[in-house]
Amino acid sequence: MMYYPDVPALEPDELELLCHEYLEYNATLDPHLADQMGVKRGLRNLDGTGVLAGITNVSNVIGYDKKEDGTIVPIPGRLVYRGIDIDTLAAEADAHDRFMFEEVIWLLLFGSLPTQEQYAKFRKLLEHHRELPQGFADDMILNSPSPNLMNKMARSVLAMYSYDEHAEDNSLPNILRQSINLIAELPTMMVNAYQIKRRVYDRSSMYFHLPTEGQSTAEHILSTYRADQKFTHEEARLLDLCLLVHADHGGGNCSTFTCRVLSSSGTDTYAAISSAIGALKGPKHGGANLKVMHQLDYILENVEDPSNDDEVREFLRKILRKERGDGSGLIYGMGHAVYTMSDPRAQILKTHAKSLAYKKGYDEEYELLCSIERLAPQVFAEEKHGPKKVCANVDLFSGLIYRMLGISEDLYTPLFAIARVPGWCAHRVEEVEFANRIIRPAYKYLGKPQEYVPLEKR
């Protein structure tokens, strides 16, 4: 359903003419030329590793060792938040059966573990700021719905500028204030945007629940998302774990680097964070877990016996050869730019998803994902004949967890944004406080000289 009236549009023949004009004069950007000129396409080295573009204290992504001759040595993956492995954080949450995301927010923002008193006050602070400013929900969400929640969240964050008397103040106290507010408000923005999207575009009922006192971020999301506001402790803990493992991933990933680039220009917090949401919206960055679920359903529909390794292996081979699936040749949920032997996030989610999968009748889906994790590296090695190692990434199991929690596919990527905003804010603070230099890489110009011809002679 189109909510807004149609606007005047270019006719198809006009668009075709414009496309022809563009392609005629812009067909010279051959990727091989970039390689020959030593250009680091995608800010990647030839071995696939990222170009070193900055330094950070926020987090570290470890997936390989490098020998003196440049050879990459695969190792088990690690993700470290402010010097602490996420495995340690997840184990702590398990040992005491408690929510950990709020502690991770503090850790990423400030670099330390909060004391008990600081932790209690910080949770109260986040609770206090979950409600949106007076009139914001009506003006920015209810009266201007969007079929895409990431689009709506980016616009909502940008609009918060108008509700902040000190929006342009880039001092440390003010950026921290803005960061805490956005971290608290974004889940409410997401759920509200989803409800109005249901009403306008899906023609379904919408329902709005006020935040409940004493809830963690994960509990707040489930409570405001579900019509009956009911959820189990196990469900909330599993969602909290998803938020924990997605909270940050180094300074070089697309959305975080986008946030750093904008922050380096001296722009405001709302512009920087909305741009990060826009980057995460891209299917090459934040939408992979949805593609995993679509591919999982496709395999279940087309493989006679999903428990048979030989059948699954050969079907994965056909996907890799672009003979089946969406034609991309990608096995979604497998492979990563940094991790080689394992992605610690995937291992944490895999371990914790099993119990709920068997309780809720998703054991077939869970076991098939485990088979894909086990068989895909072998198929990849046989088909590609290269040295690159592939392993399951965080997307392989996160989509199944959201499905088991009854969460709409509309919210898969927005939940990623909810989890990642503390990391974005931590990197923004670091960029503004310490970098002090605008990020400005170079591009090699390949255009040909041409004479200017006066308009009357053309």
Regions found by a protein language model. Name each.
Residues 2-458:
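Non-transmembrane, aqueous-exposed alpha-helical and coiled segments at domain scale
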